């Protein structure tokens, strides 16, 4: 099944540009590391940029927030359903993961303009 570049980019940022592990419960420390975002975006666009259309390029920053929110919802849903999908190490593990992802989404919302500017500076 073919994938979507926005999903791949967004999930990579969700995991790779988070200042904390996805199950760190110190939510005040969770933030998007813009230098990691920029480095990944440069590499991604240098290799895949020619295969992307303008709409995809315009939505790269948003895709990071979308995939982070989606993963947070999946962790929360799994927690509410009795932890049947994701492997957990302790009873509230998926709840901690969800809160971590939602903290990252909140930081991405604060930094969205900067994220979009980074993409724009790379593609111009």
Task: Kindly give the residue locations of the regions a language model identified.
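ATP/Mg2+ or Mg2+-diphosphate-binding catalytic cores
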Residues: 70-124
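Alpha-helical transmembrane segments
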Residues: 49-58
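Short acidic, Gly/Ser-rich segments with clustered Asp/Glu that frequently serve as metal-coordination loops
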Residues: 1-2
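Small/polar glycine-rich anion-binding or flexible loop at a beta-alpha turn
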Residues: 57-67
């Amino acid at each position: 099944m073919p994938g979507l570049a926005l999903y791949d980019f967004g999930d990579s940022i969700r995991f790779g540009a988070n200042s904390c592990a996805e199950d760190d419960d110190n939510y005040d420390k969770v933030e998007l590391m813009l230098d990691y975002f920029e480095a990944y975006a440069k590499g991604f666009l240098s290799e895949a940029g020619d295969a992307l259309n303008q709409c995809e390029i315009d939505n790269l920053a948003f895709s990071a927030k979308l995939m982070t929110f989606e993963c947070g919802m999946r962790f929360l849903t799994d927690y509410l359903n009795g932890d049947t999908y994701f492997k957990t190490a302790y009873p509230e593990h998926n709840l901690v993961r969800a809160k971590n992802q939602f903290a990252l989404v909140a930081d991405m919302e604060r930094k969205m303009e900067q994220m979009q500017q980074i993409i724009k500076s790379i593609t111009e």
